[in-house]
């Protein structure tokens, strides 16, 4: 079990498509395990829903509206006791363009 004094890498992932996000998480966890690091996660965070209300008509009829929604799915992966091999392997990892990645050391 990880202790408080160990070094860790925290990776935050965001995407609109949850399937793309889960495959990216699996790639990161597999890469960390291959380099003898200890991955914890992926931990799902709450999904952010943004709802936009738009009038359907360009002029009148304010009663007629349309709603659009974007959902942002988020995950966190913690990697404990990383080595230089772990960091190199994570940097070389090819992830899809639809996934936003934040890395904190």
Curated annotation (Swiss-Prot):
GO biological process: one example: translation
InterPro entries recorded: Ribosomal_uS10, Ribosomal_uS10_CS, Ribosomal_uS10_dom, Ribosomal_uS10_dom_sf
MF GO annotations: structural constituent of ribosome; tRNA binding
Superkingdom, natural source: Bacteria
NCBIfam families on file: PRK00596.1, rpsJ_bact
Similarity remark: Belongs to the universal ribosomal protein uS10 family.
Subunit text: Part of the 30S ribosomal subunit.
Designated name of the protein: Small ribosomal subunit protein uS10
């Amino acid at each position: 079990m990880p202790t408080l004094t160990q070094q860790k890498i925290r990776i935050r992932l965001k995407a609109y498509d949850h399937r793309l996000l889960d495959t990216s998480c699996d790639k990161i966890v597999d890469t960390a395990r291959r380099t003898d690091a200890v991955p914890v996660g992926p931990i799902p965070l709450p999904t952010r829903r943004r709802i936009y209300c738009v009038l359907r008509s360009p002029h009148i009829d304010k009663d007629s509206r349309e709603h659009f929604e974007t959902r942002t799915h988020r995950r966190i992966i913690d990697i404990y006791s990383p080595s230089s091999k772990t960091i190199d392997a994570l940097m070389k990892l090819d992830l899809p363009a639809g996934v936003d990645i934040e890395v904190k050391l």
